[in-house]
Swiss-Prot record:
This is Double-stranded RNA-binding protein Staufen homolog 2. InterPro entries: DRBM-containing_protein, dsRBD_dom, STAU2_DSRM_1, STAU2_DSRM_2, STAU2_DSRM_3, STAU2_DSRM_4, Staufen_C. The DRBM 3 domain appears to be the major RNA-binding determinant. GO terms for cellular component: cytoplasmic stress granule; dendrite cytoplasm; microtubule; neuron projection; neuronal cell body; plasma membrane. GO terms for biological process: anterograde dendritic transport of messenger ribonucleoprotein complex; germ cell development; germ cell migration; intracellular mRNA localization; protein localization to synapse. It comes from Danio rerio.
Length: 606
């Protein structure tokens, strides 16, 4: 319905039925049509009378039936109700005080309410010469009356009521009756004239505050806005703002800070425009130095050291051609030894690459594609040996470390040149010392060493003496005591010193070598105590010396556990011996105190 207070046909039917003391009944008779456009038929029974009607919804059909029933029904109608008397003379829900506030804001005059003291009750003194009146037992209190003074501009109104709010409403009603017919006062002509002049002389797109800042910036004057005063009720505030530009100052007042600031700027603009015009000074042209080119022309070595995948993508982008397409062709091998084959396609060129993982295979495929396209290989700038995984004799994985890592404390690195200098100095210090030492075959094949129960102290002492002076009096004494042929140990290589110590103490030394691009790696094992060491050098003897030096250093600090029973050195390659030794260690767990961490700490290069 247009008016929400207007009653609907169904509501009127209910009133008619209530007046005649009958019950209206609505029945849904039929429902037809598609789901999106149904038509409902509703029947209304009001006493003995029946009406039917249709609609697009049940509610609309009910309203249509009720409308037809109201028009055709012969039942007596209820008398119309008289409208309720509105005690409030003010139409709507707006109170007189709110309406007066709106009118006062339009007029630009604040409405101020002040409470007044009530009138004093008159006191009549009785004459004491006559007989007193009958004293009433119950006295009804005199109702208290509140008074409020209302000031709107130059007009004053007095309101009274039983409460302070009623007195305010009474005063507001009197003010509304007096001010409704009065015209709204116009603003002072000075402000309008100043505003017109300012708009004519200044740019219309700029405010007065912006113009003040522009003039102050040109004349290098400071600008400061300050709110001096804030007065008036909360709904009708009045602000007084002062603006200072150098030696000039002005004030502006308004019902908001923005308006007072604007009026203050408008006032001071008149003073700033009276200043003399500044002379025009041409600014010198600023010459900017051209930045040097940081990107140099690429030489023939450009791209070396880069990731081949990124390099290949950059080449295709520079050619404005399609980027390389990578695809995994196959995956083969055991679960822990996978081998992936990746294919890269650039235009009509196709290459493949293999690797232990997809990343390495993709890199190798990109490297092969670069070589096929005629570019140089993307060799790294710094040759860093790849990490090599190898199974130790005890079944544990032992990785050859990278040369770029730091050396552990206590591990000494000696190059072949240093070894030669040390050897020369030792030869000078010990004349007549033999330059050669018997090899492993000469130490007796098929027979045990002369001593089967070496002590930890003897091993550490002999190792220290060999490291310091190149000879070991303790070892010579043990040889004489055992009635074995004396084996002198002069200033020889660390690998020969270690073999001499192994012959004296009765343990076996085994080397396993592997070659990389420019270096040799040695995996040294002392059996059956299962102590492992590593060495890296430019040649096999140098890598052997590195590993042996690390072993001597470790033995000089910790010694060697006793060896149970003689050791028989078998003929054959080092790989065969390693396999047989691995079978022995699997069947008999070692009681050596040397763990994987000890082996890791004993590496020659970390």
């Amino acid at each position: 319905m247009a008016n929400p207070k207007e009653k609907t046909p169904m509501c009127l039917v209910n009133e008619l039925a209530r007046f005649n003391r009958i019950q209206p009944q609505y029945k849904l008779l039929n429902e037809k049509g598609p789901a999106h456009a149904k038509i409902f038929t509703v029947q209304l029974c009001l006493g003995n009378q029946v009406w039917e009607s249709e609609g697009s919804s049940i509610k609309k059909a009910q309203h249509s039936t009720a409308t037809k029933a109201l028009a055709e029904s012969s039942l007596p109608r209820p008398p119309p109700r008289s409208p309720k008397a509105d005690s409030n003379s003010n139409p709507g829900s707006i109170t007189p005080t709110v309406e007066l506030n709106g009118l006062a804001m339009k007029r630009g005059e604040p409405a101020i309410y002040r409470p007044l003291d009530p009138k004093p009750i008159p006191n009549y003194r009785a004459n004491y010469n006559f007989r007193g009146m009958f004293n009433q037992r119950y006295h009804y209190p005199v109702p208290k009356v509140f008074y409020v003074q209302l000031t709107v501009g130059n007009n004053e109104f007095i309101g009274e009521g039983r409460t302070r709010q009623a007195a305010r409403h009474n005063a507001a009603m009197k003010a509304l009756q007096a001010l409704k017919n009065e015209p709204i006062p116009e603003r002072p002509p000075q402000c309008s004239e100043e505003k017109k002049e300012t708009e004519e002389n200044s740019d219309a797109s700029k405010s007065e505050i912006s113009l003040v800042y522009e003039i102050a910036l040109k004349r290098n004057l400071p600008v400061n806005f300050e709110v001096l005063k804030e007065s008036g009720p909360p709904h009708m505030k009045s602000f007084l703002t002062r603006v200072t530009v150098g030696e000039f100052s002005a004030e502006g007042e308004g019902n908001s800070k923005k308006l007072s600031k604007k009026r203050a700027a408008l006032s001071i603009l008149q003073e700033l425009k009276k200043l003399p015009v500044l002379p025009v000074v041409e600014k010198p042209k600023v010459h900017y130095k051209k930045r040097p080119k940081t990107i140099l022309k690429t030489g023939p070595e450009y791209g070396q050291g880069m990731n081949p995948i990124s390099r290949l993508a950059q080449i295709q982008q520079a050619k404005k051609e399609k980027e390389p397409e990578y695809m995994l062709l196959s995956e083969r091998g055991m679960p822990r030894r996978r081998e992936f084959i990746m294919q890269v396609k650039v235009g009509t060129e196709v290459t493949t690459g293999t690797g232990p993982n997809k990343k390495v295979a993709k890199r190798n495929a990109a490297e092969a594609m670069l070589l096929q396209l005629g570019y140089k290989a993307s060799t790294p700038l710094q040759n860093t040996p790849e990490k090599m995984d190898n199974k130790g004799w005890n079944g544990q994985r032992a990785a050859f470390p990278e040369t770029t890592s730091n050396t552990q404390k206590g591990i000494l690195h000696l190059s072949p040149d240093v070894y030669q200098e040390m050897e020369a100095s030792r030869n000078k210090g010990v004349p007549g010392a033999p330059g050669n030492f018997p090899t492993a075959k000469e130490i007796g094949q098929g027979s045990a060493g002369p001593f089967c129960t070496p002590s930890v102290g003897n091993t550490a002492t002999i190792a220290k003496e060999l490291l310091l002076s190149g000879t070991s009096p303790t070892a010579e004494a043990l040889v004489l005591k055992g009635k074995a042929p004396a084996l002198a140990c002069g200033s020889i290589q660390p690998s020969q010193q270690l073999e001499y110590l192994a012959h004296i103490q009765g343990f076996q030394v085994q080397y396993s070598d592997r070659q990389t691009d420019k270096e040799f790696m040695t995996y040294l094992t002392l059996s059956p105590v299962q102590m492992t060491f590593h060495g890296i050098g430019s040649s096999i003897p140098a890598s052997h010396d590195q590993a042996a030096l690390s072993a001597l250093k470790q033995l000089s600090e910790q010694g060697l556990d006793p060896v149970d029973g003689p050791i028989k050195v078998e003929n054959g390659s080092c790989d065969i011996q390693a396999k047989r030794l691995a079978e022995r260690t699997e069947s008999k767990p070692t009681n050596s105190g040397t763990t994987a961490q000890d082996c890791k700490d004993s590496k020659a290069v970390v």
